[in-house]
């Protein structure tokens, strides 16, 4: 009897790493693989991954950026402990292949995989590669990127996506039956985006009620009460929610999206084919959100507006002066920029390396 092959997926810290990792993990499981997940205790991945049915393997490690001199001084000891714990996981799980999708946890896991002679596959989600993936790409057997040129020897395949984003109707079909006010979706992410929560209600208040878009605004749990107060103060009606369960459908139903520019958000919007105003988080590491947004904006698939330039007046003018037909054009251009087979490409590489 042939035993199923085993993969150790490594991704952590943010949804931008975790959800592409889940897409790959689910694809491998569908092909008959056993999948274990290397992460850190008390993290986002520790809450999201186990309910999906994957064995969670915790090790103690976190980033050092902005943590102060004391944390930096202890880095060698913390790294040594993380290496030891990761080595124990690799020896116990005995994966046929190790797949890293970003986050600090992938560094000790990836290095110990190489030490143990395990094939290593790396995928970089952002247009500006993170430090960990820059290092691991030098020792990996296969390297993939979501954006062209992010890693020197990386093959551009796009971002691993959940199937819901690749199964939406094309923009022409979605826009064909639409009429009336524009449908505006504002997405702040799991933590919310205070700048969007403050400015969007003010912008909508500047638009005459009869021309105002129909608005759905997602804020994150911590900011939902403040968001309700902002809309009430502006005298604007909107559907307000802390989370969106079906993001793919929400993207598809919107005429225009206002959002941050994390890698997953940008590539999911492109896969669906939707027009967006991207407002990059100004404190993102290496300003990678600006580079992510520029990928679509430069192709005519959306607008790039820096947070320092975002004002209620400018946003109101854009919303009033943009017709649905123009948004369809941008949605179509966004759609042409996204590769949708990254999940399959990464899974194929795993199988080729273990054939």
From Swiss-Prot:
Principal location: membrane
Any one Gene Ontology BP term: cell wall organization
Keyword Cytoplasm: no
Gene3D superfamilies given in the database record: Glycogen Phosphorylase B (3.40.50.2000)
Metabolic or biological pathway, per its Swiss-Prot or TrEMBL entry: Cell wall biogenesis; peptidoglycan biosynthesis
PANTHER family: GLYCOSYLTRANSFERASE, UDP-N-ACETYLGLUCOSAMINE--N-ACETYLMURAMYL-(PENTAPEPTIDE) PYROPHOSPHORYL-UNDECAPRENOL N-ACETYLGLUCOSAMINE TRANSFERASE 1
Family membership: Belongs to the glycosyltransferase 28 family. MurG subfamily.
CDD domains, per the entry: GT28_MurG
GO molecular function annotations of the record: UDP-N-acetyl-D-glucosamine:N-acetylmuramoyl-L-alanyl-D-glutamyl-meso-2,6-diaminopimelyl-D-alanyl-D-alanine-diphosphoundecaprenol 4-beta-N-acetylglucosaminlytransferase activity; undecaprenyldiphospho-muramoylpentapeptide beta-N-acetylglucosaminyltransferase activity
Recorded GO CC terms: plasma membrane
Superkingdom of the organism of origin: Bacteria
Catalytic activity: di-trans,octa-cis-undecaprenyl diphospho-N-acetyl-alpha-D-muramoyl-L-alanyl-D-glutamyl-meso-2,6-diaminopimeloyl-D-alanyl-D-alanine + UDP-N-acetyl-alpha-D-glucosamine = di-trans,octa-cis-undecaprenyl diphospho-[N-acetyl-alpha-D-glucosaminyl-(1->4)]-N-acetyl-alpha-D-muramoyl-L-alanyl-D-glutamyl-meso-2,6-diaminopimeloyl-D-alanyl-D-alanine + UDP + H(+)
Membrane topology: Peripheral membrane protein
UniProt: UDP-N-acetyl-alpha-D-glucosamine binding residues: 14-16, 126, 162, 190, 244, 289
Underlying gene: murG
Coiled coil segments of this chain: none
Name of the protein in its database record: UDP-N-acetylglucosamine--N-acetylmuramyl-(pentapeptide) pyrophosphoryl-undecaprenol N-acetylglucosamine transferase
UniProt EC number: 2.4.1.227
Keywords from the named record: Cell cycle, Cell division, Cell inner membrane, Cell membrane, Cell shape, Cell wall biogenesis/degradation, Glycosyltransferase, Membrane, Peptidoglycan synthesis, Transferase
Primary role: Cell wall formation. Catalyzes the transfer of a GlcNAc subunit on undecaprenyl-pyrophosphoryl-MurNAc-pentapeptide (lipid intermediate I) to form undecaprenyl-pyrophosphoryl-MurNAc-(pentapeptide)GlcNAc (lipid intermediate II).
HAMAP family, A to Z: MurG
Cell compartment(s), UniProt: Cell inner membrane
